[in-house]
Regions:
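Sec-dependent signal peptide recognition
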Residues: 2-10
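Residues marking helix boundaries in flexible regions
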Residues: 9, 22, 64, 165-166
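Cys-dependent protein tyrosine phosphatase-like superfamily
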Residues: 101-255, 269-362
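Ser/Thr-glycine-rich phosphate-binding loops at phosphate-binding pockets of nucleotides
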Residues: 261, 265-266
Length: 362
């Protein structure tokens, strides 16, 4: 009995010396700015966030404005449409309260200077989702197989329609490469889905601007600046799409469609144009997913590939067709659906037919 008592006592003494890992204290911070997407950028950095004991894959409880709720912490928008998240930008280290394809400001009423509290809800609660989706790419040309892969540049229809990263905005260090490629392709008309005219002028005045061909096109009136939201479900996006397509219909081929990365906004626009050209669902999906191969090395047959395909391009197709979320897009005529989508949103019949004719195979 004495031996048993001594053993228990020793074990209890051991436990008393084991350090207890304290739950991170809540972070009290403020909204530094509201970005162009209506999301709240905080006045703390990722370094502050990590030092406080929080990490990617955690679930936290956020209080901001009229909003109190639980959010996952991700370095990408790995949540369903209209779901909230704490977005930890892997490139600039900012912390943002966001809504996927929505506005956190509209949800919470929060404004610049307002107080925000972040508290731990569940450590590592969504770490598996973070690890599957962790999409971070290099800005070094040497890490990519070719200039085309680096600039996410490719022909949709050789000699008629191309897509790429921005040749004017050098934030992701690819503008000059893209500019060289569009010059070699002989691009004549550009649909810029992300910038205003004022922003383009500012970008061309920047010290690191080195895209002479884009400047030439812009100064010749061959670039339309649309400043479109990333949310393709809002009216302004579709209005911008129709305006951009009408501009292309009046321009000379080859066309270029781009945003910043040539991924989301460009993805929806190109999807619609491919549908107009009679592409199958399989062809459209394969082209869209090529961007994820270029940037992140994500290939068919992987969990990441299937997840991104389901959450992104297949949802885009369903939206264009106004289908229920559980309806197969392969059951519909995509060309007819794309034409109806554009007509219903204000594209003139003459412009639509002119665009289709310019994209048609010779």
């Amino acid at each position: 009995m004495k031996k048993l008592f001594a053993t228990i006592l020793a074990f209890l003494l051991f436990l008393a010396q084991v350090p207890v890992i304290a739950e991170p204290s809540a972070i009290n911070c403020k909204v530094a700015e509201i970005n162009t997407y209506g999301h709240a950028v905080l006045d703390i950095t990722d370094e502050d966030f990590y030092k406080a004991g929080f990490a990617l894959g955690d679930i936290v409880t956020v209080t901001a404005g009229s909003y109190t709720g639980d959010m996952p912490c991700f370095n990408g928008y790995y949540v369903d449409r209209e779901a909230t998240l704490v977005y930890i930008n892997p490139f600039v280290g900012s912390i943002t309260l966001g809504v996927n394809y929505g506005s956190f400001v509209n949800l919470s009423g929060v404004g610049k200077g307002d107080a925000v509290t972040i508290a731990m809800k569940e450590k590592g609660g969504v770490l598996d989702i973070q690890e599957v989706n962790n999409l971070v790419y290099s800005d070094e040309r040497a890490d990519f197989a070719s200039d085309e892969v680096f600039a996410n540049f490719r022909p949709v229809v050789e000699g008629k329609l191309y897509r790429s990263v921005s040749p004017v905005d050098n934030r992701i260090k690819r503008a000059r490469t893209a500019d060289n490629l569009i010059r070699e392709a002989g691009v004549q008309t550009v649909m810029n889905m992300v910038n205003t005219d004022e922003e383009i002028v500012e970008l061309m005045a920047a010290d690191d601007y080195d895209s002479p061909y884009y400047r030439e096109l812009y100064e010749a009136g061959k670039v339309i600046a649309l400043e479109m939201s990333i949310d393709y479900t809002v009216k302004a996006f579709v209005e911008g799409l129709v305006e951009g397509f009408t501009f292309l219909s009046e321009g000379e081929t080859p066309f270029l469609v781009h945003c910043l990365e040539g991924k989301d906004r460009t993805g929806f626009a190109i999807m619609t144009l491919e549908a107009l050209m009679g592409w199958s669902e399989e062809q459209i999906v394969a082209d869209y997913m090529k961007t994820y191969s270029n940037f992140y090395g994500i290939e068919p047959g992987t969990d990441r590939y299937d997840l991104i395909m389901e959450k992104n391009i297949e949802e885009m197709l369903r939206y264009m067709e106004a289908l229920q979320a559980d309806t197969s897009t392969s059951e519909t005529d995509l060309k007819t659906a794309a034409e109806a989508f554009l007509r219903e949103n204000g594209m003139a019949e003459e412009a639509l037919k002119r665009l289709e004719a310019k994209l048609a195979s010779e």
